[in-house]
Amino acid sequence: MRKIGIIGGTFDPPHYGHLLIANEVYHALNLEEVWFLPNQIPPHKHGRNITSVESRLQMLELATEEEEHFSICLEELSRKGPSYTYDTMLQLTKKHPDVQFHFIIGGDMVEYLPKWYNIEALLDLVTFVGVARPGYTLHTPYPITTVEIPEFAVSSSLLRERYKEKKTCKYLLPEKVQVYIERNGLYES
């Protein structure tokens, strides 16, 4: 059975924190690949102004293109409406019955697991991998695999705010992503 990690998110924008998490879990669990799963409309962010799918996908491609063990999975982008992890993983497990999926989540999402849509059935489809993020504990009633990662306190919301305030984002996200953001005027106030 193949072992593949899945890291979902809006990736608005993708940054070195996403890449660090994916790479650390890849090595810690001896995965074959890590698939980045950009969300269409995540239920917990419904109503927030999210950058276009096309721009987020382009930035994600730029961020991951140099790592041969990173791929982009378009499963959620092909659907309309809110993206529920259960629905996505049900489709992926049907398409790839030879794969054991490891769904990678940060500490904030570990604490939120009891509120996830159809969590009990989702646990039959994936192994959850919780990574330590600053300020969060990994306490949950559900079985998760824990991976320790070096502390790197950057988030997409922090980057959007820094761009809005015209502060530098150098060394926080890949240079190609930074150039794309600046050329396309993303995150300006």
Swiss-Prot record:
GO terms for biological process: NAD biosynthetic process. It comes from the Bacteria. GO terms for molecular function: ATP binding; nicotinate-nucleotide adenylyltransferase activity. Its EC number is 2.7.7.18. Keywords: ATP-binding, NAD, Nucleotide-binding, Nucleotidyltransferase, Pyridine nucleotide biosynthesis, Transferase. It catalyses: nicotinate beta-D-ribonucleotide + ATP + H(+) = deamido-NAD(+) + diphosphate. It holds the Pfam family CTP_transf_like. The keyword Nucleotidyltransferase applies. Pathway: Cofactor biosynthesis; NAD(+) biosynthesis; deamido-NAD(+) from nicotinate D-ribonucleotide: step 1/1. Gene3D superfamilies: HUPs. Transmembrane segments: none annotated. Belongs to the NadD family. Catalyzes the reversible adenylation of nicotinate mononucleotide (NaMN) to nicotinic acid adenine dinucleotide (NaAD). This is Probable nicotinate-nucleotide adenylyltransferase.
